């Protein structure tokens, strides 16, 4: 998958450099997102009145996804993680690895994204 362009439009919601490659915006919007080591996005929520949520498919490297109140889950190439709608979460690269995932927006009604606070170094550095 293409790496895409620097993710400048959303840089304020990331710690570190990421790149974004839109693959399709029809039916199920899908993007390839690439993270340099230690890069992660802020906590955020994919809101939906009905349906919605997000699916991550790791295609390269190693990264993390964490739902609020749960332990972080390691993602490796070929693994899929489903994020339910209306759940606060974050995702990003491992400390020592690049990370690339496909991000699929699950269709729904009344969908919107809410960006929240950064994942601090204190929280991130506790990951193995």
Task: List PLM regions with ranges.
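A short beta-strand-loop-beta hairpin characteristic of the jelly-roll/cupin
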Residues: 40, 50-77, 87
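Ligand-binding loop in jelly-roll beta-barrel domains
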Residues: 64, 72, 77, 85-113
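Conserved short histidine dyad/triad with adjacent acidic residue
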Residues: 17-19, 31-50
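Glyoxalase I/VOC metalloenzyme domain signal
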Residues: 3-4, 36-38, 84
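Short, charged/polar surface micro-motifs in flexible loops or helix N-caps
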Residues: 26-28, 35-40, 60-64, 109
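A short, N-terminal "cap"/entry segment at the start of jelly-roll beta-barrel domains
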Residues: 1-29, 42, 112-128
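Conserved hydrophobic/aromatic beta-strand scaffold that supports enzyme active sites
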Residues: 20-22, 30-34, 55, 72, ...
């Amino acid at each position: 998958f293409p790496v895409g362009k620097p993710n400048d439009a959303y840089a304020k919601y990331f710690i570190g450099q990421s790149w974004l490659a839109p693959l399709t915006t029809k039916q199920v919007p899908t993007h390839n997102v690439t993270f340099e080591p230690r890069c992660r996005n802020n906590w955020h929520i994919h809101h939906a009145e009905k349906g919605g949520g997000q699916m991550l498919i790791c295609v390269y490297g190693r990264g993390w996804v964490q739902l609020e109140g749960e332990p972080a889950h390691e993602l490796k190439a070929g693994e899929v993680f489903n994020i339910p709608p209306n759940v606060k979460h974050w995702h990003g690269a491992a400390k020592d690895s690049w990370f690339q995932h496909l991000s699929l927006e699950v269709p729904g009604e009344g969908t919107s994204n809410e960006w929240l606070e950064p994942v601090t170094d204190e929280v991130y550095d506790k990951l193995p």
